[in-house]
């Protein structure tokens, strides 16, 4: 059984750890509020560009490379969004597990998977397992901004535009030297953690490209030569220049903004997951301190009882010795 000194040392150690986890919990809570505010601030632009694209789609041929599912596609890009820091519970484990399931499904469908990663934890995970990563970007998982995410957003769009038959431009973060051939791809999937509430965050897969066009909740289906509407939708606007030209200009912006929104949502989910993990750790530390204090008190009581017994026994022995004299 541990001595009283050892128990008290453990109590001090646990209390010290508890202070750290409590501080991390409070920091994560404040970051959630900031992240939610950024997601909310980005929503009006996203809704407006979505509305404009719906109107453009209703007036255009929808014959755009970003809207077409490529028959005989060979390569699929998978972007795995992880965190730069740990102490976030199952945040990274869950998204990496989801990514592995997606990669297996794509491989079974005949695609060559090209993996990209954001977040130091994901980079370290694949490096430890000696698994290939075509590109990695770190340093912005908790507080993504437009400039920091530029290279990953542009590369995924450029790579899809080039297709598996073409080549994309080199960008910082790719695990290739400048000047080497960078083959494109035919699909782009993003695996990230969706923020649902302070207590719930789920890993999800989002197909970023090709974009599935939706006009007022009517999904467009591919015809013989191009995509055609499943319902009759009349355009409400006259476009200058024509709708196809505007769609050509706006679709890359829409995809880029959609990916940035994913980074913002993942940041909120990361902070929420870290807050939950730190709260659980703080609560567990409190319970452990209670248990250790109880054991220490019991040990102290036993020690005092033993000392009293020894004193009483010694006094009795001295009394008996005096009477015999």
Curated annotation (Swiss-Prot):
Q: Name one Pfam family in it.
A: ATP-synt
Q: What cellular component terms from Gene Ontology apply here?
A: plasma membrane; proton-transporting ATP synthase complex
Which GO molecular function annotations are given, in alphabetical order? ATP binding; proton-transporting ATP synthase activity, rotational mechanism
UniProt subcellular location: Cell membrane
Q: What does this protein do?
A: Produces ATP from ADP in the presence of a proton gradient across the membrane. The gamma chain is believed to be important in regulating ATPase activity and the flow of protons through the CF(0) complex.
UniProt cross-references to HAMAP family, sorted A to Z: ATP_synth_gamma_bact (MF_00815)
Known partners and oligomeric status: F-type ATPases have 2 components, CF(1) - the catalytic core - and CF(0) - the membrane proton channel. CF(1) has five subunits: alpha(3), beta(3), gamma(1), delta(1), epsilon(1). CF(0) has three main subunits: a, b and c.
- Similarity section: Belongs to the ATPase gamma chain family.
Question: What is the protein's given name?
Answer: ATP synthase gamma chain
Could you tell me which species this protein originates from? Corynebacterium glutamicum (strain R)
């Amino acid at each position: 059984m541990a001595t009283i000194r050892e128990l008290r040392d453990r109590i001090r150690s646990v209390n010290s750890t508890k202070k750290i986890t409590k501080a991390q919990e409070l920091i994560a809570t404040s970051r959630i509020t900031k992240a939610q505010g950024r997601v909310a601030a980005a929503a009006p632009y996203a809704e407006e560009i979505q509305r404009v694209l719906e109107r453009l789609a209703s007036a255009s041929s929808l014959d755009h490379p970003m809207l077409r599912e490529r028959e005989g596609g060979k390569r699929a890009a998978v972007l795995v969004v992880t965190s730069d820091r740990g102490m976030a519970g199952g945040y990274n484990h869950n998204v990496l597990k989801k990514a592995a399931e997606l990669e297996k499904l794509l491989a079974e469908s005949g695609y060559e998977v090209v993996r990209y990663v954001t977040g130091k934890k994901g980079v370290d995970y694949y490096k430890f397992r000696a698994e290939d990563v075509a590109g990695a970007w770190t340093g912005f998982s908790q507080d993504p901004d437009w400039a920091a995410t530029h290279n990953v957003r542009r590369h995924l769009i450029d790579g899809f535009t080039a297709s598996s038959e073409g080549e994309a431009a080199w960008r910082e973060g790719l695990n290739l030297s400048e000047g080497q051939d960078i083959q494109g791809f035919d699909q782009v999937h993003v695996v990230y953690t969706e923020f649902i509430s302070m207590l719930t965050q789920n890993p999800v897969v989002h197909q970023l490209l090709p974009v599935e066009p939706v006009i007022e909740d009517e999904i467009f289906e591919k015809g013989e030569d191009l995509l055609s509407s499943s319902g009759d939708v009349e355009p409400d606007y006259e476009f200058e220049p024509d709708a196809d030209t505007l769609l050509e200009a706006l679709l890359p912006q829409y995809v880029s903004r959609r990916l940035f929104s994913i980074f913002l949502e993942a940041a909120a989910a990361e902070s929420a997951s870290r807050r939950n993990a730190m709260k659980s750790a703080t609560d567990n530390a409190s319970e452990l301190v209670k248990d250790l204090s109880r054991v220490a008190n019991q040990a102290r009581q036993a020690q005092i009882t033993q000392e009293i017994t020894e004193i009483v026994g010694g006094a009795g022995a001295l009394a008996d010795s005096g009477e015999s004299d």
